[in-house]
Design a protein with these regions (language model features):
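Residue-level marker for buried hydrophobic side chains located in beta-strands
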Residues: 47, 203-204
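Intrinsically disordered, low-complexity terminal tails and inter-domain linkers enriched
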Residues: 2-14
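Conserved core of the PLP fold type I
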Residues: 72-198, 204, 209-216
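N-terminal small-domain helix-loop-helix segment of the aminotransferase-like
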Residues: 14-108, 113
């Protein structure tokens, strides 16, 4: 038994050695990044995370438990499962088909995938600032240059600054949160249209908070 314990100890890697390996192999710019901060929401309504502070009614919990028990959760979902979900979303939103629908595990994953899709040498991603922190984080992790364009003091879009930045940097991807996070305001629709017309790259209108604004 003593030999086994000695082998286990010899095979263990100390936290200090792991930290040294991380420092040696992980990109320096990634090491300098700050983690996404989640504030304490005790006794608060988390509008920023779109969380309901109240639990589901007992009857609905029981119904969900029955449906979950009937699923083969030991298997990955099939393509048909995703198709059915897309069709349900298309019906709900009045879409003609499902070809334009992409599903993700929350917006963070979709933002990350979009940043990776445009990650070519010299590519640039742009967004107003301040805005959702994951736009810049997704760009940095993908190794793509990020250009923040400051909002006006009243948090409205600086249309001239945005158009000038678009002309200068020719971004492959522009993120516009509508309504904006964390400022909570809707940008002027004419300003948004001007950005759409001026950009030859992809423009993402992030409408995660549209329910608070009475629609898109």
């Amino acid at each position: 038994s003593g030999g086994g314990a000695h082998q286990a100890a010899a095979g263990a890697v100390s936290p200090a050695r792991i930290a040294a390996r991380v420092e040696r192999h992980v990109r320096p710019d990634v090491q300098r990044m700050a983690a996404y901060h989640v504030a304490d929401a005790t006794d608060a309504i988390k509008l920023d995370a779109m969380e309901n502070p109240w639990r589901l009614p007992g009857a609905l919990q029981a119904e969900l438990a029955q449906r979950l028990a009937a699923l083969a959760i030991n298997r990955y979902p099939s393509g048909n499962t995703y198709t059915a979900l897309k069709q349900a979303i298309a019906r709900h939103d009045g879409l003609d088909g499902i070809d334009g629908l992409v599903l993700g595990n929350g917006s963070d994953e979709l933002i990350s995938l979009l940043c990776q899709l445009v990650a070519q040498p010299g590519a640039t991603i742009m967004a107003p600032a301040p805005s959702f922190v994951m736009y810049e984080m997704g760009a940095r992790l993908a190794g793509v240059g990020f250009v923040p364009v400051p909002l006006r003091p009243d948090f409205s879009l600086d249309r001239e600054a945005m158009l000038q930045a678009i002309e200068t940097h020719r971004p492959a991807l522009v993120f516009l949160a509508y309504p904006n996070n964390p400022t909570g305001n809707l940008f002027d629709a004419d300003d948004v249209r001007a950005i759409l017309q001026a950009t030859d790259g992809l423009v993402v209108l992030d409408e995660a908070y549209a329910p608070f604004a009475g629609g898109a």
